[in-house]
Curated annotation (Swiss-Prot):
The lineage of its organism: Bacteria, Pseudomonadati, Pseudomonadota, Alphaproteobacteria, Rickettsiales. It comes from Anaplasma marginale (strain Florida). Its main location: cytoplasm. One of its GO terms (biological process) is tRNA methylation. NCBIfam families: mnmG_gidA. This is tRNA uridine 5-carboxymethylaminomethyl modification enzyme MnmG. GO terms for molecular function: flavin adenine dinucleotide binding.
Amino acid sequence: MFYIIWLVVVLSYEVVVVGGGHAGCEAAAAAARVGAKTLLITHKIGSIGEMSCNPAIGGVAKGVVVREVDALDGLMGQAIDKASIHSTILNQSKGPAVWGPRAQADRDAYRTAMQDIVLGYKNLEVLEASVIDFSTDNEAGSPCVASVTLSCGKVLHTRRLVLATGTFLGGMIHVGRDKGIPAGRMGDKPSTRLAKALCAHGFMLGRLKTGTPPRIDRSSIDWSATAEQKGDLVPTPFSFLSDAIVLPQVSCYITHTNTKTHEIVRNNLHLAASCASLVDVAAPRYCPSIEEKVRRFPEHKSHQVFLEPEGLDSNSVYPNGVSTSCPIDVQLEMLRSIRGLENVRMLRHGYTVEYNFVDPRELHHTLETKKIKGLYFAGQINGTTGYEEAAGQGIVAGANAALSLSQNHAPFVLKRSEAYIGVMIDDLVTLGTSEPYRLFTSRAEYRLRLRSDNADMRLTEMGYNAGLVSERRFGVLYNKKQEMDRLVEELHRTSITPHTLSKCGIFISQNGEKKTAFELLGHPSITMDILIQLWPSLNSFSRAALAAVGIEGKYAPYLQRQAADIQSFLEEENASIPADIRYSEVHGLSKEAQEKLQRAQPFSIGAARRIPGITPAAIANIIIHLRCRGRASHQNS
């Protein structure tokens, strides 16, 4: 059942979140968990949790983010576990550090699951309305959020505002060379007046674009001409609180474009909105349209197309890999040139959507804007792409919006060494982005530590201390850690000689020195299953504990060496740069460096070092300046 609040008097909320997408839902729930009286405003309650593009959650790096969101008591992992119809762990042939949990979703089931969670959330109310403006007042001489204005003219007072507008901020849809349609998603109106309001408040808006493929009729596909892609035999849940996946599992299928497909696209590039001057803005580099693939990779004779079912009871199939903004007739011709799709029926055409974003260098690591206190941005408004990236930002923005209401609470900031969410936010606020930002494992310096299996071990206690995590989840973590500690202790107590191992057919360095069972895990060819064969008593531990300790033991030698790197990183991160520093007074800094530092306003030496164009010499000059400033301050006191 949906609940709509009808406003008959002026209401006041501690936190208001605008947008019911993946960032908005996580932000609103996070603020509510911390204890703030929270309002989520969405243009359509029935669209809360909508998967606007591909019907899938997770992937390489992205799947780790979903686990991190779940470890902080977020919603996405719980929702996808109720909607997963095809689950797999990507990169299983490689090490656990790059495993990528991914699940194909039943669109309707995911949306329903998210709405059920959000609409029943403690401290959280939901309003179906459109926000067109917000006002500020002065707090200690600086502008601070005071209220939001709805399209109906009503005013809501609030001290904290989170904007999670997705592709709706100044959204415009394009198909072919036809005039663009103002929309944030097909059939949904954009937030045009809110975009103008941000400009009026001094924010410089840029434009980005993304696209979506046509949807095709399941019954019109020749499945015998495609290759079946089965999911994992035993699906792995995303949430650390889920015991199992509940829905039946189905297969996905693979086909390929061909030279005829590419010829059709090439002959119509001049008609595609994404290639014409109609939409001359940056698109996702790592999720290109079929037009971009044909134009950028002319040497490729084919590209994979994944045929992904959109639901157990749905006749709609998502052809992943052929996002397009060609005219509708060209889209159908292109589809029918693909093996297995010769007689396909198109249920909905593809399109490109362009939208506004704000340079994320306008933000602190809390995702609060530098211009206006109490104003936070999360999701595509910060220049990112992807459900998972949006959810990760949402939980940080919502938590900090609520925590900042009290001076007794420290900000909730995740470091690069602690989470992929921390890597993403640091990249955004330090480097900015000129194209839709997507997470990859290669962006993380400490990916051996930032794995999908240990997200709860890394983050749940931190979230609990911030008031973001429930007693139930913390209790689950506590019990898991207790069992893992007992298992590690048992493995350290148990030892064996290389000679005895060789009798069992296991060969390691024959130096005569005993090895503990835990040390053996660091050997490339020795797994936890082998240890169980050697010491059957280990079977008394749960499979979850055995798997977790097995991975920790495998990486232990490398993690010990990486700990020194992390310590060095933390020392730089903890070397804070005062907010009132004047870079023009730092001796030896070039004018260019001064301008870059003044714009970025890095909070630490580490953040300053990551700004493009800031040299080691410039960093040394800043450190010397801060030391001199510190000595002068000490003498004056």
